[in-house]
Amino acid sequence: MLKLFSAFRKDKIWDFDGGIHPPEMKTQSNGTPLRQVPLAPRFIIPLKQHIGAEGELCVNVGDRVLRGQPLTRGRGRMLPVHAPTSGKVIAITPHSTAHPSALAELSVMIDADGEDRWIERDGWADYQRRSREELITRIHQFGVAGLGGAGFPTGVKLQGGGDKIETLIINAAECEPYITADDRLMQDCAAQVVEGIRILAHILQPREVLIGIEDNKPQAISMLRAVLADAHDIALRVIPTKYPSGGAKQLTQILTGKQVPHGGRSSDIGVLMQNVGTAYAVKRAVIDGEPITERVVTLTGESVSRPGNVWARLGTPVSHLLNDAGFCSSADQMVIMGGPLMGFTLPWLDVPVVKITNCLLAPSATEMGETPEEQGCIRCSACADACPADLLPQQLYWFSKGQQHDKATAHNIADCIECGACAWVCPSSIPLVQYFRQEKAEIYAIAQEEKRAAEAKARFEARQARLEREKAARLERHKNAAAQPAAKDQDAIAAALARVKEKQAQATQPVVINAGEKPDNSAVIAAREARKAQARARQAENIPAATEPVEPVDPRKAAVEAAIARAKARKQEQQTAAEPTEPVDPRKAAVEAAIARAKARKQEQQTAAEPTEPVDPRKAAVEAAIARAKARKQEQQAAAEPTEPVDPRKAAVEAAIARAKARKQEQQAAAEPAEPVDPRKAAVAAAIARVQAKKAAQQQVVNEE
């Protein structure tokens, strides 16, 4: 009794909500063995036959290829595709593929040479000695993908399972009507299928391996039981026929009683599922060393005279397979790739067979019936009762029709497996699956756009942060450069400080002037000349090397200027000799000397700052002649007019007015923009100003006394 209960508990199965029981229509094709189809003259191999990006091309137009030779390289989720036969690559161009939209995808076209020669095959009969990574890499590089319809790369799926897989499930349910590819494969190749299952179990090391098969396949069940008679590591579970018990989530719940969480995967609960055809492809890749170049395809429907299952090479045009099966086309003939519930109608028949093609259904007009007209939803809830995913199809229908993407997402439209059970039972003939497919595609497109926008925003913010960092670093460099002057600037600052200290030391010494003696201004003159020399040196450094050449000095003009200077000097000596020698106030003399030095220094700075312009010889000669005429006139007037006594008050007032005007002129000169000045003319004016200043000072002293 205990053994009976133990056996009952071991073989226990569960059920799932919803589901339907449509006509099976499997006897049309499952009664005949697998057969080979003659090679097509031309093969069309799409580069993308799986979930993920297409691989990188490794052949060119004109290359000769052998069967099993890689046409692309697979990295990551990029699964390679292989040549289905030997021949020549005649084109690499977009071509319509097996998809409801019939969009063109990049494909390799090969003209078969009829020899069907293989590449050199290297099988691993001792796969038990190979590491897990080696086996997964071989499976991936040999192009094995899920052959149950999803097309997910098998190597990636095995790699993602890791060590957390406790149960390996082999899906042999094949629940959709008309399709018998897995049923016939298990009948004819049961031993190879079981060997592939053992390879998968060796890679994953699960606690248990379960094969789930519906009870409407008695021949396949008997063949598997015969192969597994002495095996204790693989358990066969026969489940009731119910659509869609072959769905991944539904079969997981039937065999384990566990439900895959919303938005999750079966691996989250320790379960990994593979298809029967995938297990057979794994065996051929590992043990036989053959990449996947063909698969079993069901050819069925009343429009086919020879229904059955065939070994179809990947890339074979659909029209070639149907013609081999005795296809009788009509004006309104439809051909469905897949089953009647989850398949799609082909727009034309030159579409190639790919890895996920398991059935080609060519029904007659009476077999499928007329397509009823879509009517309004009556809220009968029949779709909700039939939904195996516990969704509310009527609500999802309204959300999809009203473009309410947020509400559709909140009602778990992503969990819809598109089995078509809701549309099958709908009394209003609403194509619910089409609405759901379109809504999921729109939601996916919106999510991709939001992802791209977020990535663009992140790139913009990163750029702004980088610019801010660069700006802060630039300001810091400028700040450090301003705080630490260059060595040349430091030398100039030190020289200026030394000059200031020297002047302060000279100013502290008392100035002693004896009456009757001429002041000794040799030190002041020497210092002035030194400063002028420094200014000229600095000006010479600042002038670029590419300046215009200095024009030669006119000797006549120089002689005239020298004569004028000598005449003024004689006149000044005569006036000094005529006037009585009086004692000079030392403080006043020191102040006047300081003022003269300041003015001279300012004049030198202006002269050094202003650019030197070329002197017009004619203009200089005219100015010299005018100056000589004015000098003669002043000498004649001074000799003719008698010397009058000078009013001290009036002289003082005039001196004050002169000083005020001088200050005003200095302020205006500082405020107004500097104009180019002739350096020679400026020097003459400065000399005249100094003479006039000395004369005014002497007159003021006389007036005060």
Curated annotation (Swiss-Prot):
Binding site for [4Fe-4S] cluster 2: 387, 416, 419, 422
InterPro entries: 4Fe4S_Fe-S-bd (IPR017896), 4Fe4S_Fe_S_CS (IPR017900), Ion_transpt_RnfC/RsxC (IPR010208), Nuo51_FMN-bd (IPR011538), Nuo51_FMN-bd_sf (IPR037225), RnfC_N (IPR026902), Soluble_ligand-bd (IPR019554)
Region (Disordered): 536-684
Binding site for [4Fe-4S] cluster 1: 377, 380, 383, 426
Gene Ontology biological process terms from the UniProt entry: electron transport chain
Keywords: 4Fe-4S, Cell inner membrane, Cell membrane, Electron transport, Iron, Iron-sulfur, Membrane, Metal-binding, Repeat, Translocase, Transport
Keyword Translocase among UniProt keywords: yes
EC code(s) of this entry: 7.-.-.-
Coiled coil: none
Cellular compartments annotated: Cell inner membrane
GO molecular function, one term: electron transfer activity
Main location: membrane
Cofactor note (record): Binds 2 [4Fe-4S] clusters per subunit.
Known cofactor(s): [4Fe-4S] cluster
Class in the EC hierarchy, top level: translocase
A single Gene Ontology CC term: plasma membrane
The keyword tRNA processing is assigned to this record: no
Membrane topology summary: Peripheral membrane protein
PANTHER family reported for this sequence: ION-TRANSLOCATING OXIDOREDUCTASE COMPLEX SUBUNIT C
Biological role: Part of a membrane-bound complex that couples electron transfer with translocation of ions across the membrane.
Quaternary structure (record): The complex is composed of six subunits: RnfA, RnfB, RnfC, RnfD, RnfE and RnfG.
Family, similarity comment: Belongs to the 4Fe4S bacterial-type ferredoxin family. RnfC subfamily.
Protein name: Ion-translocating oxidoreductase complex subunit C
Naturally occurring in which organism (per UniProt): Citrobacter koseri (strain ATCC BAA-895 / CDC 4225-83 / SGSC4696)
Gene: rnfC
